[in-house]
From Swiss-Prot:
Keywords, in A-Z order: Cytoplasm, DNA damage, DNA excision, DNA repair, DNA-binding, Hydrolase
Protein task: Excises ethenocytosine and uracil, which can arise by alkylation or deamination of cytosine, respectively, from the corresponding mispairs with guanine in ds-DNA. It is capable of hydrolyzing the carbon-nitrogen bond between the sugar-phosphate backbone of the DNA and the mispaired base. The complementary strand guanine functions in substrate recognition. Required for DNA damage lesion repair in stationary-phase cells.
Keyword DNA-binding: yes
EC number per UniProt: 3.2.2.28
Record GO terms (molecular function): DNA binding; pyrimidine-specific mismatch base pair DNA N-glycosylase activity; uracil DNA N-glycosylase activity
GO cellular component terms given for this protein: cytoplasm
Protein name: G/U mismatch-specific DNA glycosylase
GO biological process: base-excision repair, AP site formation
SUPFAM superfamilies to which the protein is assigned, alphabetical: Uracil-DNA glycosylase-like
Major location category of this protein: cytoplasm
Similarity-based family: Belongs to the uracil-DNA glycosylase (UDG) superfamily. TDG/mug family.
Source superkingdom: Bacteria
Amino acid sequence: MISDILAPGLRVVFCGINPGKSSAHTGFHFAHPGNRFWKVIHQAGFTDRQLRPEEELQLLDTRCGITMLVERPTVQASEVALQELRSGGRELVRKIEEYQPQALAVLGKQAFELAFNQRGAKWGKQAITIGTTQVWVLPNPSGLNRATLDKLVAAYRELDDALATRGQ
């Protein structure tokens, strides 16, 4: 079982789609060696150094957290059913209302659209909020995503810069 990394007063909560088999096996978020999450958030400015999956709790020191839309592990996110995403979206809203981070970053456009019943989402900041929490859609850092490391870092840096502009 993989646990959420949540606390009050966070700058951002990164929301993955669901755990992969490597994460399920190790118990840590974004644990597959091909997943670029830890490298991306470091290069985008969220962490001072590149954390390893087993150091995930240190994210709280940077006022960042992690949750996921669906708890069930799969080999690929495409194996997650629509009902699971919709249910996960409702649960995610509940968590965000409870913890009230400055921003929620959903990692994947299609997952965001399905979980929140939105159409035509663009990358970046969304028009919707959850209370006062900004909602962002960022590319998924999975190695299966064809986005280059530079494009991932640029997308995540936009969020880091926006939070810095808000003094967060």
